C-alpha cells in the first residue's frame, strides 16, 4: 500500500485478513445527497422544489379566464455565512425567487385566446440551507433532520393472526396506502363477508365500492367466480364437467358417462379418478335434479314472453325455480362455482348483506359514511367519491407506491398512474380472496422491502408543498376578484404561509433535532440515525415487539446493535456502514458478484426485495488465490435463513466483515467476543465521551477511526495537494501543486481553523494544526485535528494502564479506583464552555439599562466589571459573581404631580430601579473567554460594544490583508517566473519594486499575454480585497435584528476546566461502565517488578457475568502494543542506528498470519523512519477489524516481540505494604472514556429557595434549585427508628408548614432553638380535594 507523507507519520498495524474490496463510503452522504436532490434544478420535475412547483402550478381561476404559471426558480446567496449565523442566532438560509407568468385569456373569444401575459420574479420566503457537514443552523443552533423509516406506499395484505375474534379465526385484510390521500382497507369479518373501510372509518360491504364504480351484480359475479353450467335435455339435468373442480369432494351420486361408472356414490374423489375422467375426455355428466338445489344463479333470467324476472343474479336455486326456468324456455343455466376448500362464496355472500342496488345508492352510502349528518345530493356524492381515489390533486400513490402495488399484484410493468383505476381495486380484492382461499401469502410489514426511508430532502419537499397548497387557495381567490389588468404576479403571492410551513418543519418537527455534538462520533451517528417515530410514523406506546425486533432483512442495512435502551429500543436505529438508499428510498447493501463459482470484485447493491431471491455467502468464507471457495459447503443466507449450500449454488458474497454493523459498533475492537447487550451499551456510550484536553489515539482500534474523524468534518482536510507555506494556531496556508491548479488562479488555499468554540453540549471545539512548515500534503490529508482527533484518527478517550483485581472494596459493584497520577497528568481533564446571556428589554415602566451603577452592591462585586457594566475577558469568576450589571425600573407607586415635578427638576432617584444583573449560576466557576454585545438598530451602542466592534474590524482587516499578502506572494512568484522565462534578468528584477514588474514589456508574445493575464488577476485580487473588507465592515457595524422588545443582548462565554473526580462516570468500549470511587495516591497503587504503578484498578467480577470478553483481549493486545512502543523508545534513547530501528519496526508490522496490510519500510527514507519511530514511542497503534480481528496466537506473538509474558499476567506488589499479591494479575492497556455524566453537573444542595404554589413544598431538581424529597420510604425508615421529633420536623417546618417555617427562621435569628410545628399546607390541600368530592371535613379545636 502507498502511504502519503502525512500518513507515514503513524501507521496503524492492521490484523485484518480479508481483502478490502470496497472502501468505506462517505458517511454523511445520506443527508447531503438527499438535500442536494431537493434544491438542485431537476429538468424531469421528479424531485425537490421543481416537483413541488409543478404539482401545484399552473393555478387557474374558478372562471378559467386567467391562470398563474410557473416558469423557474433560483436560490439566492445567503446573507451570513454559517459561523456568523451561529454567533448572531439567525437561520442559515437562502432567499427563494420564483419566476411566475400571469396569463389572462379573452373572455368572449374562443378557448385559449391570450389577452395579456405578465412575467415577474416573486420572492417566496427563505429556504434553510444545509452546511457542508449535513446540519442546519436554525436560530443560531445546529440541528439535524433525522431520516424516517415509514411504511412504504403500496398495497399490503395482512391478517390479524386470530386475535380479533374470540373463536381464534384468522381474518385477512388488504390495505392500499397512498403517498398522500385516503387509505382504502378491505377486510373479512368472522362470517366471511368482505367489507371496505375508507380512512379507517366505519365499514361498508365491499361490493358497495364496486357498485360505485358502476358494476352491476351480474358483472360483479362474473369478475369473481367461475361458472358451472347446467343444461336441461329431455327432462334430464346435465352438467358441463371440469374434472379438476371435483378434487377432494365426496360423490353424492354415481358419476358415470358413456355407461361407465367412474366414481360410486359416497366415495371420495381422488386424483386417480380425475386423471381417468380427463383421459376419457368426459365433458358432460348427468346429475340428479336435487343436485342443483342451493346453487347460486350467475345472472338474471327473464321470462321472454311476459318480461317478468324469474330469478335475479345471486339468488339460490330451488326445484320450483328450476321448473319455472324450464317452462319459460331457459334450457342453459349458469351457476357460480364455489366449494369449501379453495373457492369460497365470499363476494356472493357479501352482496346479500349489501343494502344498495345501483350506483347512486352506493355513492350516497359512501357519502353518509364519510360526512355523517350532511344531506347527500347526487353531485356532492359523485364528486366526493371521485376525489377520494381518482383525482391527482387529492390522491397520489407516487412512483414507489405504484411500483410496490404492481409488484404485489405480480404485474409486468412497474410504472403507471399515481391514482387508482377500477382494475387496481378489483385486482386487490381478487388477491385478498385468493389469500383467504389459501393461495398466496400475507406480507411481512417489518420486512425492509415494505419500509422505506424518508430523508431530509423528501420531508422538506412535502412541507414546502403544504405551504404552496395554502398559497394556492389564496391565489385562486385573487384571480377571481377581477381587475387583473393592474395586478402583477407578486400581488397574488403571499410568501408567509410557505416560509411558515418550512420554518415549522425545521424548527419544531419531531424529526428536526438539536444536534448531539459531544464528539465527532456522536455527530456522525446522529446524522445516520433512522427513526420509526415522527409524523406519519409509529408512536412509542403503540409499537409492539415485532417492529422493534431485529429482522433478517436488517443485514447490512440497519445495525442490529446500536439502538437506545429504554422506551425507544428498536424504534431508533442506525444505518450500517455500507448501506445506502436507492431511487425509491429502500435501503440497499453491496455484495460481490459470484460468477461460475468465482468471487469477482464486481459490486452490486441489492435492496431487501431483490436479496430474497439469491444465495449469499458470508464475508469470512475462505477463498483461494483465484477467488474460488475453499470448502465444498459454504455458510450462506437465503430467504432470511442461514444454512449450508454447495459452493456452486452461491450467487453473491458479502463485501466486508463489518458490513452488518453501524459506524459506532464498528469502532469496538473484538466486538465478536462481546455479548450483544453489552456491545449495545458500548456503542451508545462512545457517543457520550467528552473530548479530553489532549486527544490520545486508541492503541487498539479497528481501522475505522480515520474514516470517522475525516468524514465527521471536525478536522481540516486538504482540498488539494501542495506544500505547507505558512502555519500558525489559527490558519494554515497551502501552496497548491501546479497540476491541481485551475488556469488563472493564485494557487493558494487558506484554511482558517475554529478556535475554542462552544458545542451544543457545552464541550469545547478547537482545531490544532498537525502539519509543519514545508511539508508536502496530498488531497484528503488531515491538516488540523479537531476535538477528539489525534493525527486524523478518532480519539475519544485515553489509553490507561489497568489491572483487574479487587482493591479494598473500592471497586465493588463496578466502581473504579483511579491513581492520582491520572489527575496530575490531566489525562481526563476536559474543557466546557458555557454561554450566559443577559437580555435588556423595553418594559412598560421604561427601558432596562446595562450599567455598572447598581443599587446596594459593594465595590468588591463590581471589581470585575468595566465602566459599561460588562465583565472583562480573562476574569476568573465563581458562583454568584456579577457578569453583566443591569437595572430594571421599578414602578411600585403612582407618583403625585408634585413628585413628578421634583423628579423632572432634580433628576431620577436611585431607589426606583431594582438590580436584575446576570450572575454566575451556583456551583459554576471559570474564566471569561469571550463577550459579545448585540444592539438593536437605532439604539446607541455603549463603549464596550464599540470596543468589540473595533477589535473585530481590526481582526478582519488583519486576516484579509494577510490573506491578500499570501495570495500576492503566490501571484508575484508566478509573475517572476514568466518574466525570467521571457528574458528579464533575475538580479534586475529583484532591484525593482514589485508593483513595477507588471509594467515591463516582453518580446515573446505568448509570455506577454501571460503577463497581462497575471496583471489582470492582480487588479482583480485587490478589487476583491476591497469588496470583502467593505462587506465585513458593513456586517460588523450594522445593528442586529433582535426580537421585539429587546434592546440589547450581552453574551458571556465561560470556560470551565473539569478535572476527573470521584463520582464521575467512566467506561470502556465494551459496555463496561462504572463510577470513580476514589482517587488513590500514586504510592498506594499496586506496582509491578519494574516499579511501574497501574493507573486504574477494575473489578474482575464485572467480566464473567456480563460476557464482554473483548475488554480482556483488548487489555492484552494493548499491553503488547505498549511493549513494542517501550522497546522502540529504549532504542531511540540509546540512539541506535536507523537500520536496527527499521528492522525491528518492520518485524512488528510483518507479524501475524496472512495479514492484508503490507508495510515496506525499505521504501521509507531514514528521516521518515525516525519520525515514525518517534510517533510509535508511546505504543504501536493496532487495528483489529470487527469479525476479522487478531487471533489469540497473534496476540501472544506480539507480546513475545515486546518481551512480555504471553499469559498477559504479571506479579504485582501492594503499594502500601510492598508485599506481593498472591497470584499474577491481568495488567494491560485499555482505552477508557470519560462520559458526559459529570458529578459537578449533578451535585446540588439547597438551603432556602422557591416553593411550589399549591402545596407550598420546595421544588425538586437542580434546575429549579429544589430540595431533596423526603418520600414515603424515608418516612418509614424514621418511623422504624422511632425518631418521632425528627420526623415531625421533616414533615412540617422543613417542608410545607408556612407559619412554622417563618417562626423557625425568627427563632434561629433570636438564638432561641425551639420549633413550633403547625398545620402542613399539603393537609389543607387534601381537605380541599375531599370537599370537591362533596364531603365537608372541618377540624375542631378541643
Curated annotation (Swiss-Prot):
GO molecular function: DNA binding; DNA-directed RNA polymerase activity; ribonucleoside binding
Quaternary state and interactors: The RNAP catalytic core consists of 2 alpha, 1 beta, 1 beta' and 1 omega subunit. When a sigma factor is associated with the core the holoenzyme is formed, which can initiate transcription.
Similarity comment: Belongs to the RNA polymerase beta chain family.
Function field: DNA-dependent RNA polymerase catalyzes the transcription of DNA into RNA using the four ribonucleoside triphosphates as substrates.
GO biological process annotation, one example: DNA-templated transcription
EC category name: transferase
Record EC number: 2.7.7.6
GO cellular component: DNA-directed RNA polymerase complex
Lineage summary: Bacteria, Pseudomonadati, Pseudomonadota, Gammaproteobacteria, Enterobacterales
PANTHER family, A to Z: DNA-DIRECTED RNA POLYMERASE I SUBUNIT 2
Superkingdom as given in the UniProt entry: Bacteria
PTM-bearing positions, type N6-acetyllysine: 1022, 1200
InterPro entries, alphabetized: DNA-dir_RNA_pol_bsu_ext_1_sf, DNA-dir_RNA_pol_bsu_external_1, DNA-dir_RNA_pol_su2, DNA-dir_RNAP_su2_dom, DNA-dir_RNAP_su2_hyb_sf, RNA_pol_bsu_bac, RNA_pol_bsu_CS, RNA_pol_bsu_protrusion
Name used for this protein in its record: DNA-directed RNA polymerase subunit beta
CDD domains documented for this protein: RNA_pol_B_RPB2
Organism of provenance: Escherichia coli O6:K15:H31 (strain 536 / UPEC)
Family annotation (HAMAP family): RNApol_bact_RpoB (MF_01321)
Amino acid at each position: 500500500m502507498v502511504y502519503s507523507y502525512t500518513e507515514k507519520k503513524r501507521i496503524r498495524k492492521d490484523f485484518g485478513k480479508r481483502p478490502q474490496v470496497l472502501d468505506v463510503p462517505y458517511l454523511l452522504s445520506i443527508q447531503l445527497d438527499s438535500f442536494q436532490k431537493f434544491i438542485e434544478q431537476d429538468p424531469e420535475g421528479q424531485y425537490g422544489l421543481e416537483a413541488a412547483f409543478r404539482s401545484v402550478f399552473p393555478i387557474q381561476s374558478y372562471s378559467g379566464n386567467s391562470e398563474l404559471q410557473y416558469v423557474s426558480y433560483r436560490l439566492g446567496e445567503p446573507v451570513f455565512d454559517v459561523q456568523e449565523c451561529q454567533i448572531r442566532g439567525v437561520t442559515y438560509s437562502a432567499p427563494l425567487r420564483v419566476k411566475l407568468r400571469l396569463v389572462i385569456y379573452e373572455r368572449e373569444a374562443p378557448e385559449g385566446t391570450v389577452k395579456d401575459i405578465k412575467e415577474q420574479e416573486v420572492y417566496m420566503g427563505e429556504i434553510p440551507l444545509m452546511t457542508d457537514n449535513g446540519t442546519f443552523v436554525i436560530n443560531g443552533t445546529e440541528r439535524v433532520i433525522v431520516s424516517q423509516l415509514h411504511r412504504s406506499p403500496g398495497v399490503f395484505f395482512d391478517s390479524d393472526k386470530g386475535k380479533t375474534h374470540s373463536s381464534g379465526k384468522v381474518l385477512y385484510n388488504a390495505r392500499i396506502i397512498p403517498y398522500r390521500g385516503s387509505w382504502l382497507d378491505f377486510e373479512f369479518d368472522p362470517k366471511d363477508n368482505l367489507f371496505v373501510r375508507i380512512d379507517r372509518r366505519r365499514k361498508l360491504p365491499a361490493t358497495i365500492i364496486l357498485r360505485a364504480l358502476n358494476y352491476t351484480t351480474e358483472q360483479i359475479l362474473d369478475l369473481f367466480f367461475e361458472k358451472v353450467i347446467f343444461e336441461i335435455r329431455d327432462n334430464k339435468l346435465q352438467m358441463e364437467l371440469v374434472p379438476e373442480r371435483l378434487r377432494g369432494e365426496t360423490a353424492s351420486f354415481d358419476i358415470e358417462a358413456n355407461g361407465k361408472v367412474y366414481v360410486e356414490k359416497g366415495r371420495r374423489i381422488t386424483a386417480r379418478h380425475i386423471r381417468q375422467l380427463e383421459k376419457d375426455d368426459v365433458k358432460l355428466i348427468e346429475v340428479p335434479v336435487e343436485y342443483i338445489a342451493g346453487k347460486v344463479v350467475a345472472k338474471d333470467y327473464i321470462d321472454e314472453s311476459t318480461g317478468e324476472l324469474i330469478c335475479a343474479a345471486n339468488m339460490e336455486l330451488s326445484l320450483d325455480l328450476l321448473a319455472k326456468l324450464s317452462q319459460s324456455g331457459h334450457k342453459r343455466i349458469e351457476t357460480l362455482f364455489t366449494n369449501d376448500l379453495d373457492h369460497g362464496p365470499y363476494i356472493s355472500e357479501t352482496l346479500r348483506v349489501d343494502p344498495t342496488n345501483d350506483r347512486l345508492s352506493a355513492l350516497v352510502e359512501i357519502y353518509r359514511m364519510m360526512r355523517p349528518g350532511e344531506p347527500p345530493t347526487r353531485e356532492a356524492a359523485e364528486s366526493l367519491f371521485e376525489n377520494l381515489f381518482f383525482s391527482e390533486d387529492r390522491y397520489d400513490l407516487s412512483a414507489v407506491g405504484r411500483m410496490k402495488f404492481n409488484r404485489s399484484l405480480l404485474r409486468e410493468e412497474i410504472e403507471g398512474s399515481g391514482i387508482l383505476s377500477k382494475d387496481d381495486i378489483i385486482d386487490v380484492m381478487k388477491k385478498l380472496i385468493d389469500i383467504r382461499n389459501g393461495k398466496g401469502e400475507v406480507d411481512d410489514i417489518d420486512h425492509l422491502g415494505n419500509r422505506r426511508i424518508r430523508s431530509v430532502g423528501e420531508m422538506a419537499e412535502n412541507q414546502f408543498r403544504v405551504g404552496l397548497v395554502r398559497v394556492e387557495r389564496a391565489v385562486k381567490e385573487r384571480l377571481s376578484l377581477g381587475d387583473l389588468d393592474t395586478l402583477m404576479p407578486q400581488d397574488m403571492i403571499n410568501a408567509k404561509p410557505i416560509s411558515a410551513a418550512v420554518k415549522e418543519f425545521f424548527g419544531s418537527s419531531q424529526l428536526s433535532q438539536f444536534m448531539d455534538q459531544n464528539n465527532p462520533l456522536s455527530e456522525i451517528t446522529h446524522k445516520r440515525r433512522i427513526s420509526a417515530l415522527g409524523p406519519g410514523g409509529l408512536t412509542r406506546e403503540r409499537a409492539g415487539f415485532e417492529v422493534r425486533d431485529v429482522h433478517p432483512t436488517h443485514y447490512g442495512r440497519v445495525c442490529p446493535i446500536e439502538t437506545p435502551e429504554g422506551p425507544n429500543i428498536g424504534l431508533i436505529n442506525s444505518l450500517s456502514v455500507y448501506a445506502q438508499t436507492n431511487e425509491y428510498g429502500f435501503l440497499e447493501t453491496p455484495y460481490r458478484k459470484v460468477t461460475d463459482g468465482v468471487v469477482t470484485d464486481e459490486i452490486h447493491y441489492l435492496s431487501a426485495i431483490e436479496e430474497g431471491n439469491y444465495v449469499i455467502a458470508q464475508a469470512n468464507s475462505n477463498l483461494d488465490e483465484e477467488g474460488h471457495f475453499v470448502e465444498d459447503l459454504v455458510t450462506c443466507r437465503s430467504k432470511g435463513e442461514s444454512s449450508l449450500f454447495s459452493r456452486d449454488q452461491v450467487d453473491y458474497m458479502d463485501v466486508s466483515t463489518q458490513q452488518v454493523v453501524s459506524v459506532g459498533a464498528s469502532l469496538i475492537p473484538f466486538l465478536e467476543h462481546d455479548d450483544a447487550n453489552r456491545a449495545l451499551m458500548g456503542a451508545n456510550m462512545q457517543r457520550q465521551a467528552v473530548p479530553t484536553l489532549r486527544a490520545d489515539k486508541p492503541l487498539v482500534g479497528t481501522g475505522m477511526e480515520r474514516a470517522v474523524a475525516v468524514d465527521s468534518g471536525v478536522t481540516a482536510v486538504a482540498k488539494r495537494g501542495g506544500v505547507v507555506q505558512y502555519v500558525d494556531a489559527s490558519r494554515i496556508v497551502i501552496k497548491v501543486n501546479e497540476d491541481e491548479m485551475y488556469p488563472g488562479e493564485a494557487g493558494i488555499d487558506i484554511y482558517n481553523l475554529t478556535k475554542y468554540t462552544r458545542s451544543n453540549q457545552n464541550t469545547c471545539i478547537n482545531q490544532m494544526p498537525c502539519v509543519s512548515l514545508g511539508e508536502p500534503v496530498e488531497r484528503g490529508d488531515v491538516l488540523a485535528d479537531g476535538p477528539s482527533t489525534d493525527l486524523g484518527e478518532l480519539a475519544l478517550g485515553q489509553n490507561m494502564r489497568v489491572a483487574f483485581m479487587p482493591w479494598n472494596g473500592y471497586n465493588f459493584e463496578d466502581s473504579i479506583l483511579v491513581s492520582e497520577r491520572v489527575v496530575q497528568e490531566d489525562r481526563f481533564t476536559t474543557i466546557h464552555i458555557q454561554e450566559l446571556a443577559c437580555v435588556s428589554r423595553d418594559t412598560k415602566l421604561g427601558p432596562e439599562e446595562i450599567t455598572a451603577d447598581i443599587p446596594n452592591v459593594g465595590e468588591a462585586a463590581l471589581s470585575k466589571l468595566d465602566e459599561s457594566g460588562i465583565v472583562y475577558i480573562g476574569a476568573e469568576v465563581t458562583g454568584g459573581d456579577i457578569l453583566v450589571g443591569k437595572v430594571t425600573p421599578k414602578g411600585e407607586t403612582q407618583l403625585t404631580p408634585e413628585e413628578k415635578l421634583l423628579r423632572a427638576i432634580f433628576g431620577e432617584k436611585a431607589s426606583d430601579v431594582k438590580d436584575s444583573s446576570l450572575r454566575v449560576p451556583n456551583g459554576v466557576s471559570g474564566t471569561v473567554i469571550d463577550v459579545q454585545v448585540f444592539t438593536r438598530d437605532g439604539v446607541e451602542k455603549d463603549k464596550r460594544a464599540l470596543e468589540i466592534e473595533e477589535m473585530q474590524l481590526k481582526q478582519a482587516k488583519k486576516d484579509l490583508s494577510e490573506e491578500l499578502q499570501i495570495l500576492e506572494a503566490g501571484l508575484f512568484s508566478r509573475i517572476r517566473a514568466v518574466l525570467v522565462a521571457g528574458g528579464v534578468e533575475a538580479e534586475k528584477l529583484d532591484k525593482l519594486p514589485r508593483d513595477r514588474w507588471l509594467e515591463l514589456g516582453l518580446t515573446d508574445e505568448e509570455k506577454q499575454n501571460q503577463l497581462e493575464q497575471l496583471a489582470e488577476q492582480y487588479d482583480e485580487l485587490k478589487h476583491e480585497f476591497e469588496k470583502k473588507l467593505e462587506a465585513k465592515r458593513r456586517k460588523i457595524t450594522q445593528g442586529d435584528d433582535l426580537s421585539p422588545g429587546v434592546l440589547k443582548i450581552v453574551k458571556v462565554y465561560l470556560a470551565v476546566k473539569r478535572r476527573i473526580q470521584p463520582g464521575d462516570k467512566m467506561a470502556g468500549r465494551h459496555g463496561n461502565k462504572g463510577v470513580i470511587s476514589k482517587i488513590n495516591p500514586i504510592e498506594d497503587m499496586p506496582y509491578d517488578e519494574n516499579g511501574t504503578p497501574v493507573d486504574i484498578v477494575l473489578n474482575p467480577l464485572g467480566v464473567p457475568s456480563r460476557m464482554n470478553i473483548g475488554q480482556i483481549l483488548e487489555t492484552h493486545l494493548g499491553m503488547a502494543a505498549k511493549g513494542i512502543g517501550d522497546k522502540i523508545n529504549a532504542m531511540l534513547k540509546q540512539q541506535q542506528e536507523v537500520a536496527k530501528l527499521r528492522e525491528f519496526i518492520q518485524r512488528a508490522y510483518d507479524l501475524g498470519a496472512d495479514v492484508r496490510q503490507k508495510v515496506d519500510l525499505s521504501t521509507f527514507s531514514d528521516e521518515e523512519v525516525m519520525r515514525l519511530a518517534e510517533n510509535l514511542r508511546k505504543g504501536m497503534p493496532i487495528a483489529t477489524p470487527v469479525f476479522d480481528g487478531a487471533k489469540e496466537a497473534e496476540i501472544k506473538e506480539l507480546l513475545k516481540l515486546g518481551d512480555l509474558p504471553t499469559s498477559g499476567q504479571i506479579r504485582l506488589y501492594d503499594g502500601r505494604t510492598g508485599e506481593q499479591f498472591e497470584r499474577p494479575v491481568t495488567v494491560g492497556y485499555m482505552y477508557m472514556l470519560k462520559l458526559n455524566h459529570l458529578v459537578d453537573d449533578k451535585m446540588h444542595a439547597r438551603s432556602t429557595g422557591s416553593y411550589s404554589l399549591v402545596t407550598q413544598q420546595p421544588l425538586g431538581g437542580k434546575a429549579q434549585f429544589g430540595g431533596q424529597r423526603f418520600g414515603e420510604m424515608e418516612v418509614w425508615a424514621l418511623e422504624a427508628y422511632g425518631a418521632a421529633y425528627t420526623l415531625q420536623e421533616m414533615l412540617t417546618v422543613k417542608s410545607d408548614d408556612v407559619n412554622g417555617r417563618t417562626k423557625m427562621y425568627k427563632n434561629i435569628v433570636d438564638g432561641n432553638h425551639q420549633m413550633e410545628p403547625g398545620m402542613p399546607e399539603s393537609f389543607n390541600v387534601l381537605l380541599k380535594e375531599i370537599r370537591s368530592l362533596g364531603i365537608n371535613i372541618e377540624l375542631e379545636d378541643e
